[in-house]
Regions:
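Non-catalytic, hydrophobic alpha-helical segments
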Residues: 11, 67, 177, 223-227, ...
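A conserved pocket-lining segment of Rossmann-fold NAD(P)-dependent short-chain dehydrogenase/reductase
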Residues: 198-218
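Substrate-positioning beta->alpha
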Residues: 117, 159, 212-229
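NAD(P)H-binding glycine-rich loop region in Rossmannoid oxidoreductase-like domains
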Residues: 8, 28-127
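Alpha-helical substrate-binding/gating segment
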Residues: 219-264
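Conserved beta-loop-beta element that borders a ligand/cofactor-binding pocket
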Residues: 131, 136-141, 146, 150-153, ...
C-alpha cells in the first residue's frame, strides 16, 4: 500500500495515476475528500487528514509500505497561505515585512507545511516503512545565490531543507527528489483518465545529479515518474538528487540506469 500525500496537487495527481497504472494499491491523505473523489473516483482509498495536525495521521499511515510526499505551498505569500482573518492592504504590508506576524496569521506557510508538516508525517510513519519519497526543490544548498535567494525570500527553501533533514535523520529508507522549476501542468481540472494521457511538452531528456548544481525546468510528469519509479529500484534508496529536463529525449526514460549512475 502506497500513501500519497499531496495527491490532489500538480505532481501528486500524476503520481497517483502512475501508481495505479503499475497496479499498486494507493491510499491518499487529503484535506478535501470531495476534490479527491472527483479526481480519482473509487480507484484509491481516501483518508481525510492534514500533516499540520499530527492527530489526523496515524490512521492514514497504518499498514502502508511506502509514502510519497508531494506537499507544498506557494513560495511567496498568497491566498494559499490561508490567512485568518483575510488581510487588508495595511496588513499585507505587515505580512511582507514581519516574519513573526506572517507565521502567526497564516496557517499554510512553507514553514508549517514543508518543515513542521513533513516532520509530523515522518514521526508518524511506520518504523518498517520500505521507502519515504519526498519532493523538495533545487537551490536548497544555494539559497544565498541568485535566483534562489529571491525564491527563498519567505523561507521556502529553508523549510524544504528542514523537511529533508527530518527524513534523513529518521532512520527510514528514503529518496529525496529536488526538481527544478515545475512545468507541464498543473492538470488540476482533468479527470484521471485525461491526466494519464498528458505528455511532457518540452520533449527534453531527464537529467539527474547530486550536490545541488543543476538548474532549469522540470516536467511535473517526469518528477512524478521519478517518485514512482524510485520505489521499485534499490539504487535510489538513501539518495538525494536534483532533476531537470535538458537535451534530446530518448524514446523511453531508463530510470534504473539513471539511479545506478548516482554516486553512493
Amino acid at each position: 500500500m502506497v500513501l500519497v500525500v499531496g495527491a490532489t496537487g500538480g505532481v501528486g495527481q500524476i503520481v497517483v495515476g502512475k501508481l495505479l497504472e503499475k497496479g499498486a494499491k494507493v491510499r491518499i491523505l487529503t484535506r478535501n475528500a470531495e476534490k479527491a473523489k472527483k479526481l480519482f473516483n473509487d480507484k484509491v482509498e481516501v483518508f481525510v487528514g492534514d500533516i499540520r495536525k499530527p492527530n489526523t495521521l496515524p490512521a492514514a499511515v497504518d499498514h502502508v509500505t511506502h509514502i510519497i510526499c508531494c506537499t507544498g505551498t506557494t513560495a511567496f505569500p498568497s491566498a494559499r497561505w490561508e490567512f485568518d482573518p483575510e488581510p487588508n492592504l495595511f496588513e499585507w504590508g505587515k505580512i511582507l515585512l514581519d516574519s513573526d506576524y506572517r507565521e502567526a496569521t497564516a496557517k499554510n506557510t512553507p514553514a508549517k507545511v514543508d518543515a513542521e508538516g513533513v516532520s509530523n508525517l515522518v514521526a508518524t510513519a511506520p518504523k518498517n516503512l520500505s521507502r519515504f519519497v519526498f519532493v523538495s526543490s533545487v537551490g536548497i544548498l544555494r539559497k544565498d545565490q541568485p535566483p534562489f535567494n529571491i525564491l527563498n525570500a519567505f523561507g521556502v527553501l529553508d523549510a524544504k531543507k528542514k523537511g529533508e533533514e527530518a527524513i534523513i535523520n529518521s532512520g527510514l529508507p528514503y529518496t529525496i527528489i529536488r526538481p527544478g522549476r515545475l512545468i507541464d501542468g498543473p492538470y488540476t481540472s482533468y479527470d484521471l483518465n485525461t491526466l494519464l494521457k498528458a505528455t511532457t511538452g518540452g520533449k527534453l531528456n531527464v537529467v539527474i545529479g547530486k550536490g545541488d548544481t543543476l538548474a532549469g525546468d522540470a516536467s511535473r510528469i517526469d518528477v512524478a515518474a521519478a517518485c514512482v519509479e524510485s520505489i521499485f529500484y534499490s539504487a535510489s534508496e538513501g539518495q538525494v538528487f536534483e532533476l531537470v529536463n535538458k537535451g534530446i529525449r530518448p524514446p523511453t526514460i531508463d530510470w534504473e540506469t539513471l539511479f545506478l549512475q548516482l554516486p553512493t
